[in-house]
């Protein structure tokens, strides 16, 4: 999907509006949210991580790209919501000392899209809080 390269380019330029334009064009072409998450957002963020690891971009650039990706997810979330509900629940979040929450956020969104009731706890959640979450 060449859109992932275009999306990545806009991420690295810090152009949130252009990133959202890429996503909206894909939605208009009836590309599924799941495919956008997998083949555009995930793929682009993996490349951002590789660039940072290789010293080709700064921490600030990586954080900006992540921030833009999260804002795109926030806009896409409204398209994920469904009236279909099933009798299943999930508590989703990152383990202690894990601050990279975009991947689990996408998983959470897809569970919701499939009718699950999801409690997304975000980054760096103590294990005891998962066990004791009370979201039963």
Regions found by a protein language model. Give the residues of each.
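Conserved mid-sequence domains
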Residues: 86-136
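Long amphipathic alpha-helical segments
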Residues: 1-84
């Amino acid at each position: 999907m060449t859109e992932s390269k275009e999306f990545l380019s806009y991420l690295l330029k810090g152009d949130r509006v252009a990133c959202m334009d890429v996503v909206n064009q894909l939605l208009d072409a009836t590309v599924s949210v799941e495919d956008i998450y997998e083949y555009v957002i995930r793929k682009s963020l993996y490349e951002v991580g590789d660039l940072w690891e290789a010293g080709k971009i700064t921490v600030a650039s990586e954080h900006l790209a992540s921030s833009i990706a999260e804002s795109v997810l926030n806009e896409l979330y409204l398209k994920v919501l469904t009236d279909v509900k099933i009798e299943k629940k999930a508590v989703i979040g990152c383990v202690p000392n894990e601050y990279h929450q975009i991947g689990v956020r996408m998983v959470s969104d897809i569970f919701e899209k499939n009718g699950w009731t999801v409690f997304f706890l975000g980054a760096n959640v103590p294990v005891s809080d998962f066990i004791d979450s009370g979201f039963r």
